[in-house]
C-alpha cells in the first residue's frame, strides 16, 4: 500500500492536498511492461524522496532539464528525448502500466537522457525538484474535467502556475497542450493572471505546435476529423 497525494483545488484555485491510498496492482501490467520495469528501473527510475534531487549526479552531466507531467504511455516523451540528446528529460506518471510502457520503449531506443518517476506529480514538484532548476515543464493533454462542476479538479490553477514558475529557470517555459478548447481558454485565463510569466504567442493566445512536441497518432486522427489542438507556452520572466 502506498500513500500518494492527488491534487484538488477550491473555487479560487487554492491547492487542497488530499492523501489517498491506492494499491499498486501488479496484475494490471502486461508481461512486457513488468519486464521493462525490472530491466530498466535501476538505470532510469527515480524513487521519490522529499529532498531535492541533484540533477548533475542523476544524469552525470550539466544540461538543461525538461520535465513532463503525466506522460501517459511515454511514447512521445521517449521520442523527444531521443531527438534532443543534449537535454535531460524527467517524466512523472502515476499509472504503473504507463511507466512500464515508457521504460520498454526507452530501452529499445537506447536513450540515456531520460529518468522517470512513478509518483504523484504535485508531491515530486513540491519536494524533489529544486527551485529554478528546469528549462521547460510540459503538460500535454491533462484531464479536461469537462463538466463545469469538476473544473476545480483541473490541474492548471493559480497555485499550480506559481509552483511551476518557481521550478523554472528565468527564461524557462511552461508548455501546455489540450484538445479541449474550453480548457485552453481556462489555461489562458489562469496564466494571463499569473505573475512572472509572459505569453510566447505574438497574438497573446495560442501558438503553433512547436517542433519539439511530436504529433501523436491520436492527434493526427483528430486533425483528420477536424478536431483542434491548442498549444500554450508561457515564459518565466521574473
UniProtKB/Swiss-Prot annotation:
The active site is at residue 143. The keyword tRNA processing applies. It catalyses: guanosine(46) in tRNA + S-adenosyl-L-methionine = N(7)-methylguanosine(46) in tRNA + S-adenosyl-L-homocysteine. It holds the Pfam family Methyltransf_4. Pathway: tRNA modification; N(7)-methylguanine-tRNA biosynthesis. InterPro entries: SAM-dependent_MTases_sf (IPR029063), tRNA_(Gua-N-7)_MeTrfase_Trmb (IPR003358), tRNA_methyltr_TrmB_bact (IPR055361). It is an enzyme of class 2 (transferase). The keyword tRNA processing applies. Its EC number is 2.1.1.33. Keywords: Methyltransferase, S-adenosyl-L-methionine, Transferase, tRNA processing. S-adenosyl-L-methionine binds at residues 68, 93, 120, 143. GO terms for molecular function: tRNA (guanine(46)-N7)-methyltransferase activity. Substrate binds at residues 147, 179, 216-219. It comes from the Bacteria. GO terms for cellular component: tRNA methyltransferase complex. Catalyzes the formation of N(7)-methylguanine at position 46 (m7G46) in tRNA. Belongs to the class I-like SAM-binding methyltransferase superfamily. TrmB family. This is tRNA (guanine-N(7)-)-methyltransferase. It comes from Shewanella denitrificans (strain OS217 / ATCC BAA-1090 / DSM 15013). The gene is trmB.
Amino acid at each position: 500500500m502506498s500513500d500518494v497525494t492527488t491534487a484538488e483545488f477550491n473555487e479560487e484555485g487554492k491547492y487542497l492536498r488530499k492523501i489517498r491510498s491506492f494499491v499498486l496492482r501488479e496484475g494490471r501490467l502486461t508481461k512486457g511492461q513488468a519486464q521493462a520495469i525490472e530491466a530498466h528501473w535501476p538505470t532510469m527510475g527515480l524513487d521519490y524522496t522529499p529532498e531535492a534531487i541533484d540533477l548533475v549526479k542523476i544524469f552525470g552531466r550539466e544540461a538543461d532539464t525538461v520535465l513532463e507531467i503525466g506522460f501517459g504511455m511515454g511514447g512521445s516523451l521517449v521520442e523527444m528525448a531521443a531527438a534532443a540528446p543534449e537535454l535531460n528529460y524527467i517524466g512523472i506518471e502515476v499509472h504503473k502500466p504507463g511507466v512500464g510502457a515508457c521504460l520498454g520503449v526507452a530501452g529499445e531506443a537506447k536513450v540515456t537522457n531520460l529518468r522517470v518517476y512513478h509518483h504523484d506529480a504535485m508531491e515530486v514538484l513540491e519536494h524533489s525538484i529544486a527551485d529554478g532548476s528546469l528549462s521547460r515543464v510540459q503538460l500535454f493533454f491533462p484531464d479536461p474535467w469537462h463538466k463545469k462542476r469538476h473544473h476545480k479538479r483541473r490541474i492548471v490553477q493559480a497555485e499550480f502556475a506559481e509552483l511551476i514558475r518557481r521550478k523554472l529557470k528565468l527564461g524557462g517555459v511552461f508548455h501546455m497542450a489540450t484538445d479541449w478548447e474550453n480548457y485552453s481558454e481556462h489555461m489562458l485565463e489562469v496564466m494571463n493572471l499569473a505573475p512572472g510569466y509572459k505569453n510566447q504567442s505574438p497574438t497573446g493566445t495560442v501558438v503553433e505546435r512547436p517542433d519539439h512536441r511530436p504529433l501523436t497518432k491520436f492527434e493526427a486522427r483528430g486533425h483528420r476529423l477536424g478536431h483542434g489542438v491548442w498549444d500554450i507556452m508561457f515564459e518565466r520572466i521574473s
